[in-house]
């Protein structure tokens, strides 16, 4: 979760009232923030936020804005925002190359003038930039931001897809490097180049004199892209891959600059070719948020309250949220700097915070029930105890993984596996149908530890339901364990299996397994009353090599659900 350090005097100046540290701690509570200490030497307050949905609070100006609104009823007005059908006068243009639509499509900006930046303001701006890009911007992948002295920039600015061989002097260096060299040599290139390095061309910002402004989202130009104490005219741009996230980040920063005392001058972004949007140009900062409907009955039902519409609207106003009624329906208008109202429930949460948690009295539950462990969980715990008693160490794994680990390395078919239709990353593309790949992956990184290794997991697996005409899935609880060492053989694991089922008081039958990941003749399927419930055996050298394992391994896996139902 985001942690920020803000100068206490700057913060209290914006709030407009002095508070002790303990009072500040109380002021932060409604906004899911915790007072984490005060450094007398630096004069900074340390604050930790327990929510990532409100990036507008991660600066001293944004936090002061919310506190003034909540406790003193001061809702700010930001009249520099454009709206649909009402674009403000623009003071510069950003021209977007149509090739950027497949790389990093969105860029928006504004100019800020009229205030001299001092050292503490600059430090606060840089910290906010970092927090915004790291947390809300997902380490610059989703959103990245740049700040520049606008006196060195000639508009219009071009946002182009450039050759990786294009050279300029990056910030913090005194020699020219190509974009490829920046990726490989510059600290920021090493940290962030993975975001764009798979593309044939890279994003570049050029002014009208063809000077490089920045290489987003990696690094600014050394000649133009550094903000200094004493600067008064600033250009701010935000690039990103998500339209609304990019716009919101720019809106939040614009409101912060305005609250500091700057004049905000809008900048127009011109898309030379539509990017699947319903416009070809946009004057920013731009208000894009949609109104959200709410129902008074739903508010009172979820909160267990009896609030009137008027009281609800007052509570929302304390959160900086305006509301109105039309045709017997009620709507909230999200503030310029917020986009966290996805559902009526989000509105109700703001009503609750606006009312104050102390105004809601605790009640005993009206329903009474006695809880207990399910039979499956009790049986699973017995199995865990047996495994620990036999010298195994319990592991806990993620249920999702890659095709490479679950299927390719195991040399098996993907017939039983569930695949995510739109995965964020290939590392979490499939839901596991077996625990064995997880155990082997652990073993592959454990060669430095003394042998033998004995690990197990009791966990969920999911299989396609192949026995019906309707698509579906079956979820089971499985036990799997792995033994590795120079002396580990089929006889060793067979002895452990026999001991396990002896203490479970279950009789099983064994038949030779045809699974590809076992050595021929050294794998067995486990049958209980003619039903196959699992298997065990020695892993083949081919599979071991796929995982980078160079020591013999034997594995076991059984379906606990079937074990219970058939025993």
From Swiss-Prot:
Instruction: Supply the SUPFAM superfamilies for this chain.
Output: Class II aaRS and biotin synthetases (SSF55681), Putative DNA-binding domain (SSF46955)
Q: PANTHER family of this UniProt entry?
A: PHENYLALANINE--TRNA LIGASE BETA SUBUNIT (PTHR10947:SF0), PHENYLALANYL-TRNA SYNTHETASE BETA CHAIN AND LEUCINE-RICH REPEAT-CONTAINING PROTEIN 47 (PTHR10947)
Signal sequence extent: none
Which keywords has UniProt assigned to this entry? Aminoacyl-tRNA synthetase, ATP-binding, Cytoplasm, Ligase, Magnesium, Metal-binding, Nucleotide-binding, Protein biosynthesis
- Family stated for the protein in its record: Belongs to the phenylalanyl-tRNA synthetase beta subunit family. Type 2 subfamily.
Q: Name one GO cellular component term.
A: phenylalanine-tRNA ligase complex
- The encoding gene is pheT
The subunit structure is: Tetramer of two alpha and two beta subunits.
Under which EC number(s) is this enzyme classified?
6.1.1.20
Q: Which residues form the B5 domain?
A: 287-362
User: Where in or outside the cell is it found?
Assistant: Cytoplasm
> Which cofactors are reported in the record for this sequence?
Mg(2+)
User: Which top EC class is given?
Assistant: ligase
Q: Which residues bind Mg(2+)?
A: 340, 346, 349-350
Q: Which reaction does it catalyse?
A: tRNA(Phe) + L-phenylalanine + ATP = L-phenylalanyl-tRNA(Phe) + AMP + diphosphate + H(+)
- Name of this chain's protein: Phenylalanine--tRNA ligase beta subunit
Primary residence: cytoplasm
PROSITE patterns, alphabetically?
A: B5
What GO molecular functions are on record for this protein?
A: ATP binding; magnesium ion binding; phenylalanine-tRNA ligase activity; RNA binding
UniProt GO BP: phenylalanyl-tRNA aminoacylation
């Amino acid at each position: 979760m985001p942690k920020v350090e803000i100068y206490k005097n700057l913060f209290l100046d914006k709030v407009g009232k002095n508070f002790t540290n303990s009072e500040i701690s109380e002021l932060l509570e409604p906004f899911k923030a915790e007072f984490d200490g005060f450094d007398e030497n630096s004069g900074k307050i340390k604050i930790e936020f327990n929510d990532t949905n409100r990036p507008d609070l991660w600066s001293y100006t944004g936090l002061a804005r919310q506190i003034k609104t909540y406790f003193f009823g001061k809702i700010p007005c930001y009249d520099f925002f454009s709206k649909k059908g009402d674009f403000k006068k623009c003071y510069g243009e950003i021209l977007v190359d149509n090739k950027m639509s497949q790389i990093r499509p969105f860029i928006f900006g504004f100019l800020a003038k009229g205030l001299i930046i001092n050292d503490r303001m600059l430090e606060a701006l840089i910290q906010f930039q970092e927090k915004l890009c790291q947390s809300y911007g997902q380490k610059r992948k989703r959103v990245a931001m740049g700040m520049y002295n606008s006196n060195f920039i000639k508009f219009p600015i071009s946002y182009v897809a450039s050759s990786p061989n294009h050279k300029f002097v990056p910030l913090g260096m005194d020699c020219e490097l190509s974009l490829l060299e920046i990726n490989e040599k510059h600290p920021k290139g090493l940290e962030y180049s993975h975001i764009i390095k798979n593309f044939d061309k890279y994003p570049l910002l050029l002014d009208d004199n063809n000077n490089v402004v920045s290489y987003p989202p990696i690094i600014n130009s050394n000649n133009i892209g550094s903000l200094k104490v004493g600067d008064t005219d600033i250009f701010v741009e935000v690039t990103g891959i998500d339209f609304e996230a990019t716009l919101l980040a720019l809106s939040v920063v614009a409101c912060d600059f305005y609250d500091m005392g700057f004049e905000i001058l809008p900048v127009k972004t011109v898309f030379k070719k539509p990017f699947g949007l319903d416009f070809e140009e946009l004057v920013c900062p731009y208000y894009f948020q949609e109104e959200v409907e709410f129902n008074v009955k739903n508010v009172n039902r979820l909160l267990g309250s009896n609030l009137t519409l008027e009281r609800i609207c007052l509570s929302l106003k304390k959160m900086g949220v305006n509301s109105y009624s039309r045709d017997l329906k009620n709507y909230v208008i999200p503030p310029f700097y917020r986009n966290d109202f996805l559902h009526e429930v989000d509105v109700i949460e703001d009503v609750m915070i606006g009312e104050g948690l102390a105004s809601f009295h605790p009640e005993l539950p009206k329903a009474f029930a006695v809880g207990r462990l399910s039979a499956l969980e009790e049986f699973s715990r017995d199995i865990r105890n047996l495994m620990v008693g036999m010298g195994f160490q319990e592991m806990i794994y993620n249920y999702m993984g890659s095709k490479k680990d679950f299927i390719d390395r195991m040399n098996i078919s993907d017939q039983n596996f569930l695949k995510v239709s739109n995965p964020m990353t290939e590392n979490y593309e499939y839901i596991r149908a077996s625990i064995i790949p997880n155990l082997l992956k652990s073993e592959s990184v454990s060669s430095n530890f003394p042998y033998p290794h004995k690990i197990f997991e009791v966990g969920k697996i999911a299989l396609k339901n192949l026995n019906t005409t309707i698509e579906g899935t079956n979820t089971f609880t499985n036990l799997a364990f792995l033994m590795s060492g120079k002396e580990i053989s089929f006889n060793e694991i067979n002895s452990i299996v026999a001991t396990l089922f002896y203490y479970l008081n279950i009789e099983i039958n064994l038949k030779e397994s045809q699974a590809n990941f076992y050595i021929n003749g050294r794998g067995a399927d486990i049958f209980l009353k003619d039903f196959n419930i699992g298997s065990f055996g020695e892993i083949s050298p081919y599979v071991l090599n796929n995982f980078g394992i160079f020591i013999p391994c034997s594995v076991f896996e059984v379906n606990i659900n079937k074990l219970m139902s058939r025993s």
